[in-house]
Curated annotation (Swiss-Prot):
GO biological process, one term: phosphatidylethanolamine biosynthetic process
Protein family according to the UniProt entry: Belongs to the phosphatidylserine decarboxylase family. PSD-A subfamily.
Pathway: Phospholipid metabolism; phosphatidylethanolamine biosynthesis; phosphatidylethanolamine from CDP-diacylglycerol: step 2/2
Principal location: membrane
Name of the protein: Phosphatidylserine decarboxylase proenzyme
Details of cofactor binding: Binds 1 pyruvoyl group covalently per subunit.
Cofactor(s) required for function per UniProt: pyruvate
Organism: Carboxydothermus hydrogenoformans (strain ATCC BAA-161 / DSM 6008 / Z-2901)
PTM comment: Is synthesized initially as an inactive proenzyme. Formation of the active enzyme involves a self-maturation process in which the active site pyruvoyl group is generated from an internal serine residue via an autocatalytic post-translational modification. Two non-identical subunits are generated from the proenzyme in this reaction, and the pyruvate is formed at the N-terminus of the alpha chain, which is derived from the carboxyl end of the proenzyme.
Modification Pyruvic acid (Ser), positions: 180
The EC number(s) this enzyme carries: 4.1.1.65
Function: Catalyzes the formation of phosphatidylethanolamine (PtdEtn) from phosphatidylserine (PtdSer).
The organism's taxonomic lineage, starting at the top: Bacteria, Bacillati, Bacillota, Clostridia, Thermoanaerobacterales
Length: 213
């Protein structure tokens, strides 16, 4: 089944509202209508879902999101992996593609939504206290945890998966509306990390790690 090029379902009410405002604005003043129409086009742009060619290497772990790597750090992950892990934090600006993708194939084993604050996503402590959604995926090689985190502008997390779902690598997990951060936790002893702080990555394309062995 082909994915839509624009996530119309998730952006439906934004597009309807702006479509109506475009017509009303044009009736009042041409330039006002044009301004609202440009905003309408930006929202279409924001909800875009470009086609991605997923790497076939079964040991490759791909980025779950587009954006810039904010940090790569060794941590102790306590929600799902429950042990030593490498955390890769990816910041998404409002101009990035905002869908999240499965970094590996496997079964969704864990989903947990935690309420919190809405601090700017680039703040270091935002990842600890902002609202977020945890998605744990398991396959015969490893367990991976993806965390969708809200930001100051991004206040709506959409998840497409539930426990028990079987995912293909690169399959859509969900999206975060209007700027955000996505984190991925990889088991430290199992994975070789291939990205570094400041690097731009692309969801479904960039190989951020490889399973050892």
């Amino acid at each position: 089944m082909k994915e839509p090029l624009v996530m119309y379902r998730e952006g439906f009410w934004y597009l309807v509202a702006l479509g109506v405002l475009t017509v009303l604005g044009a009736l009042i003043n041409f330039w006002l209508g044009l301004l609202v129409f440009l905003l309408f086009l930006f929202v279409v742009f924001f909800f875009r879902n470009p086609r991605r060619t997923i790497p076939e290497d079964e040991k490759a772990i791909i980025s779950p999101a587009d954006g810039v790597v904010l940090d790569v750090a060794e941590v102790n992950e306590s929600y799902y992996l429950k042990g030593p892990a490498v955390k890769i934090s990816i910041f998404l600006s409002i101009f990035d593609v905002h869908v999240n993708r499965a970094p590996v194939e496997g079964q969704v084993e864990y989903v947990y939504y935690r309420e919190g604050k809405f601090l700017p996503a680039f703040k270091s402590h935002a990842s600890e206290i902002n609202e977020r959604n945890y998605i744990g995926i398991k396959n015969p090689y490893l367990q991976v945890l993806v965390v969708q985190i809200t930001g100051f502008i991004a206040r709506r997390i959409v998840s497409f998966v539930k426990p028990g779902d079987i995912l293909k690598k690169g399959q859509l997990l969900g999206m975060i509306k209007f700027g955000s951060c996505t984190e991925i936790y990889l088991p430290k002893e199992t994975v070789e990390v291939l990205v570094q702080k400041g690097q731009r990555v692309y969801g479904g394309i960039t190989v951020i790690g490889r399973i050892k062995g």
